[in-house]
């Protein structure tokens, strides 16, 4: 059985053995790991560790090629970021017309040539492919207002929030469709990320989530399913209160399972959602990996494997 076949079995809950993904270590850890294992890049790293799958993020493969070198989103108007609450260009906006006149990015400047080359290289090495634009619309909208302003404007200027969200999502939707038209048959799972939780709870209420997130969110899951792909959502934090909504919206698998966030322990998740979701992750990165012993890490991986069963990707 190839890794792609095994990964497909995991996603379809037909596997007899869990998978493994080495994840996305932070730069300092990555430098150390690459040196220790004598590898040069993420591709070689995954092969060395025997990863079942590989994440190919278009942003890391020169997808955006604006002739003037402009980024596709510039929420701070060229200013350097110093906090998540830093006011963005729409911090004081109260008029949808201002949003409509803003120079939103044109997906025609997306070039997936290098991304597709990496996809082909990954398949040739017998690894399943996770890909798609990161599509972190929730974060992007937040940046265009500043986090506090964003949450306030959901109540004071909801039409402005919805307009900004629509423009950002439209860019990602068109970019993803351009990629999917070229390579959907080679992408095993659409992987995108929006962190909806903090350590203790959701960042916004479930009611606000239903109004300002879900109508956009479901567009991405529907698009991926239209092209025959499963959907893996990355969402850090305590998101237990909206997991049923995410399942209803078409999420097939969930990452990273922030083990120490409230309500995200493996026992609860496996019992509550194990029939509906494939879990990717779950190994505690806040305490266990940085401070635990090798034996403790091994024991925890075995515990997670036993809880989630064979239809699980250790990461």
Task: Tell where the protein language model's regions lie, with residue ranges.
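Residue-level detector of functionally special positions within alpha-helical transmembrane segments
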Residues: 2, 46, 50, 74-83, ...
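Active-site loop segments of alpha/beta catalytic cores
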Residues: 1-40, 82-83, 101-315
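Short, solvent-exposed loop/edge-beta patches enriched in aromatic
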Residues: 15, 47-56, 66, 125
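Intrinsically disordered, low-complexity regions
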Residues: 24, 36, 47, 51, ...
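Secretory-pathway glycan-assembly enzymes, especially type II membrane glycosyltransferases
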Residues: 55-57, 77, 116
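A contiguous, low-structure linker/loop signature
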Residues: 61-111, 125-128
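Catalytic domains of carbohydrate-active enzymes, especially glycoside hydrolases
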Residues: 39-59, 182-183
């Amino acid at each position: 059985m190839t890794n792609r076949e095994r990964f497909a079995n995991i996603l379809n809950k037909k596997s007899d053995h869990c998978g493994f993904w080495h994840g996305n270590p932070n730069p300092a850890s990555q430098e150390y790991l690459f040196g220790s294992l004598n590898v040069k890049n993420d591709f070689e790293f995954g092969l060395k560790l025997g990863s079942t799958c590989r994440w190919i993020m278009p942003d890391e493969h020169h997808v955006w090629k604006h002739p003037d070198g402009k980024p596709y989103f510039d929420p701070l108007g060229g200013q350097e970021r110093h906090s998540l609450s830093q006011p963005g260009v729409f911090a004081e906006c109260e008029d949808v017309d201002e949003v409509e006149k803003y120079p939103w990015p044109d997906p025609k400047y997306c070039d997936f040539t290098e991304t597709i080359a990496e996809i082909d290289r990954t398949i040739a090495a017998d690894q399943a492919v996770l890909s798609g634009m990161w599509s972190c619309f929730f974060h992007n909208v937040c940046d265009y207002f500043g986090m506090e302003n964003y949450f306030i404007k959901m109540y004071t200027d909801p039409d402005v929030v919805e307009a900004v969200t629509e423009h950002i999502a439209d860019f990602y939707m068109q970019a993803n469709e351009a990629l999917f038209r070229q390579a959907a048959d080679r992408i095993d799972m659409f992987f995108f990320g929006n962190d909806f939780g903090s350590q203790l709870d959701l960042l916004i209420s479930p009611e606000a989530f239903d109004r300002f997130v879900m109508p956009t969110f479901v567009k991405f899951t529907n698009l991926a399913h239209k092209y025959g792909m499963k959907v893996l959502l990355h969402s850090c934090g305590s998101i237990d209160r909206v997991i049923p909504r995410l399942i209803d919206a078409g999420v097939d698998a969930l990452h990273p399972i922030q083990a120490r966030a409230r309500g995200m322990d493996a026992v609860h998740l496996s019992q509550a959602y194990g029939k509906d979701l494939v879990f990717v992750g779950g190994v505690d990165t806040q305490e266990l990996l940085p401070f635990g012993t090798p034996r403790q890490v091994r024991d925890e991986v075995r515990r997670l494997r036993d809880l989630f069963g064979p239809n699980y990707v250790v990461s």
